[in-house]
UniProtKB/Swiss-Prot annotation:
Pfam families: AP_endonuc_2. The keyword Metal-binding applies. The keyword Cytoplasm does not apply. This is Probable endonuclease 4. It comes from Escherichia coli O139:H28 (strain E24377A / ETEC).
Amino acid sequence: MKYIGAHVSAAGGLANAAIRAAEIDATAFALFTKNQRQWRAAPLTTQTIDEFKAACEKYHYTSAQILPHDSYLINLGHPVTEALEKSRDAFIDEMQRCEQLGLSLLNFHPGSHLMQISEEDCLARIAESINIALDKTQGVTAVIENTAGQGSNLGFKFEHLAAIIDGVEDKSRVGVCIDTCHAFAAGYDLRTPAECEKTFADFARIVGFKYLRGMHLNDAKSTFGSRVDRHHSLGEGNIGHDAFRWIMQDDRFDGIPLILETINPDIWAEEIAWLKAQQTEKAVA
């Protein structure tokens, strides 16, 4: 079964994320459990936790269908010790919040070397950051997102993801989330079914589908191989509809959150309905 949804707002309370997901007929959703542009957040109250769990139960969302995202400020590969420690503490807090909410996944951008250390050193720092967080939490899997490779961000090559996983001690609690826009911008073609087959054959060989714990389904305003992260609505960008139809018809993408971060929330319900309709072999544009 495909779990299909969007990254919805949790404004007004975390329980509202589940309510908003249900309103667009989503069978999955993503959310921030705190303000994504601030370091600190008030601890979760018992009331907030209970209301969130109740809303998820009411609308039939299990932890397998929910892909929370951490703060954009966190850089687990930071070259400066003090800043690295700050990011690690914030990441542990994000993991603990997921643990309290009964969530089993935490999606995050791996990190940036800021032109101050080597890629290898940065990737090793990211892996060690994950090890520290896993040691201090239980039941939550760290889900590394591939990036477009803007600036000094790592994670734009499948080899980067594999290197991080290789450095994580508890392989049962690490995974990846593949963002289609990021992959396309990083040079992984998805414009035709044949290119999708090739790209995901590379993924299977280098990383492995056993580590795929989520997807971000985004078309791209950015051009192929541009290393620029600009999302677009499905079928309106440079990837086109075929990739998303191909994903919907491949059972390797079953049982994980497939999350829209497309640019027009007003049509998320339509995009979700379209994706659901592509699951049959006879589906057409």
